[in-house]
Amino acid sequence: MALMTPQEYIESLRKLNTRVYMFGEKIENWVDHPMIRPSINCVAMTYALAQDPQYAELMTVKSSLTGHTINRFTHLHQSTEDLMNKVKMQRLLGQKTASCFQRCVGMDAILSLIHIS
């Protein structure tokens, strides 16, 4: 499977059957809502940088499970080098977004489960 582009990520959100409420009101077009869209844009940046030849080496890695190129956020770390690249990737995204890019907690939770199970 090819790496997802930022546009494909955003379109995948539009296809979800999601009900979103904010401040007691239902939000029909939550993907484009001005309070939600900045977070979506930050996640989209994780896909954009993976597509950019300048950052692809840092943002992507060969999967130890499939052998396919995957986004580093979905990679199961195998070495200290993987962990160092994770930190470098997070620093780069912090510089590019000046915000939380929303994927760290999920990545850390999955990696914790891998190591204890």
Model-derived regions, located:
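N-terminal-proximal low-complexity accessory segments that begin disordered
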Residues: 2-48
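Short, flexible active-site-proximal loops enriched in glycine and acidic residues
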Residues: 85, 97-111
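Extended, charge-enriched "interface" segments that sit outside catalytic cores
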Residues: 32-35, 39-92
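Conserved small/polar residues in nucleotide/adenosyl-binding loops
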Residues: 114-117
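Unusually extended, aromatic-enriched hydrophobic runs near protein termini
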Residues: 1-2, 62
